[in-house]
Regions:
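A bilobed periplasmic-binding-protein/Venus flytrap-type ligand-binding module shared by bacterial periplasmic
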Residues: 100-103, 264-278
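Hinge/lid segment of periplasmic solute-binding proteins
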Residues: 44-96, 121, 147-150, 237-250
Length: 282
């Protein structure tokens, strides 16, 4: 993308990759030092706090959205990043989280797809057989964004959210208890230790996990198309065997919310207040 941008505009771009969990602290430190990058690719959670802190140039972002046309963006992506008279950052992409599961094992055991708490718990009883097969690899490392993403998905599945159309909404005690009881069950069927995206992918790719929750970024890897993260279920890193045995669920339900819910992540380009604004806006 950086090379294509330079070819089109003549503007060179240095891409600085950092770990997702370090994004907040790195941006805050760079802001204090007056050394922010021109543009930051970030999640929704940073849009409004960074705008309020003076890290993001909301006028520049608003000008971009207006020049491209508000109608070319999903209204929800704009409203979630809305500030007075504009937006904090420019929506660029997003994805829907997935329950990734071994469809071959489910079919062999006569199990329904893991579209609900109940279906997952039934599958755990039949498929959890450690250490050769873990029923689930739940996120348990509390300082990883991954755990927040997985937990939010599980909460929404049961119709629990801390916000509603009026703003803050207290958590429903009974529904929240159902969420936590379910999460305990998938943690119990997971390996010991602090787990996040890395372990869940590694164990699933090794054929040692029946279910994980992951983003669509796993799909190319699952098909053996990424050298740095190949499936290890067999000796061929380019094999499509695991992909052929995998099923995907996006809408997931709890007992108090039979219609279920999906969880999505929206990403933004934020132009910083240290940027060469005209170049950054391109």
């Amino acid at each position: 993308m950086a090379e294509s941008f330079k070819a089109k505009t003549g503007i060179g771009v240095e891409v600085i990759p950092i770990s997702e969990k370090d994004l907040g602290t790195r941006a805050t430190a760079a802001f204090a030092a007056g050394d922010l990058p021109d543009v930051i690719y970030h999640t929704l959670q940073y849009a409004l706090p960074w705008a309020e802190a003076g890290i993001l140039d909301t006028d520049a972002a608003t000008d971009i959205v207006n020049s491209l046309g508000k109608s070319t963006f999903a209204s929800g992506a704009l409203s979630m990043a809305a500030v007075d008279n504009g937006v904090a950052a420019v929506p660029v992409d997003g994805w829907t989280q997935m329950v990734v599961y071994r469809k071959d094992l489910f079919d062999k055991a006569g199990l329904d797809a893991p579209t609900s708490y109940a279906n997952v718990e039934k599958a755990l009883k039949k498929l959890h057989n450690p250490p050769s097969m873990y029923g689930f690899v739940a996120a348990t490392k509390v300082d990883e964004n991954f755990m927040s993403q997985v937990l939010e998905h599980v909460f929404l599945a049961n119709g629990v959210s801390p916000v509603d159309s009026g703003g803050f909404s207290p958590l429903d005690e009974a529904k929240t208890t159902e969420v936590l009881d379910f999460y305990k069950s998938i943690v119990k069927a997971s390996p010991p230790g602090e787990l996040f995206w890395q372990q869940s992918r590694e164990l699933y790719f090794a054929g040692k996990a029946a279910m994980i929750i992951w983003s669509p970024f796993i799909l190319d890897e699952l098909a053996g198309l990424r050298d740095s993260a190949p499936p290890t279920i067999n000796s061929d890193p380019t094999s499509g065997e695991l992909a052929s045995k995998t099923g995907i669920v996006t809408t997931f339900s709890g007992p108090s919310n039979p219609s279920g819910a999906a969880w999505g992540d929206v990403r933004y380009f934020g132009i910083t207040t240290d940027a060469e604004t005209d170049e950054a806006m391109k």
